[in-house]
């Protein structure tokens, strides 16, 4: 087993292990295509894409596993619950940005106050939109009823 797990770049002082999963080309390709790491995206578009994905999948657990799952209003309550969680996540992103990026006003990258604000607003718009699209799809497709 020791031939599979070894220090990263054969340097034992880095504090990271090189495993077949962490150093594989497929893993690097997959992680490189995630919106947070993709080159050429503005913080607003990064937040929009991440928010759409999160909003889309957040409505399902509230709809299927929520306390009103057997009522006729389960989908609407699931939508409002997803909206509430999106508000909490947006508040958390805002607080993180205010605490982490004090005095870094300039720049359009994600590691500045302006970039993080753009990311947060894109996330909230995308998440509300993604949850709304999921609601419309679940409400209008009879397969899920």
Swiss-Prot record:
Gene3D superfamilies: Photosystem I PsaL, reaction centre subunit XI
Family annotation (HAMAP family): PSI_PsaL
Keywords of the record: Chloroplast, Membrane, Photosynthesis, Photosystem I, Plastid, Thylakoid, Transmembrane, Transmembrane helix
KW Transferase (keyword) present: no
Positions of transmembrane segments: 48-68, 75-95, 125-145
Pfam families on file: PsaL
GO CC term, one of those recorded: chloroplast thylakoid membrane
Assigned protein family: Belongs to the PsaL family.
Cysteine-cysteine disulfides: none
Localisation per UniProt entry: Plastid, Chloroplast thylakoid membrane
Annotated membrane topology: Multi-pass membrane protein
GO biological process: photosynthesis
Domain of life: Eukaryota
Name of this chain's protein: Photosystem I reaction center subunit XI
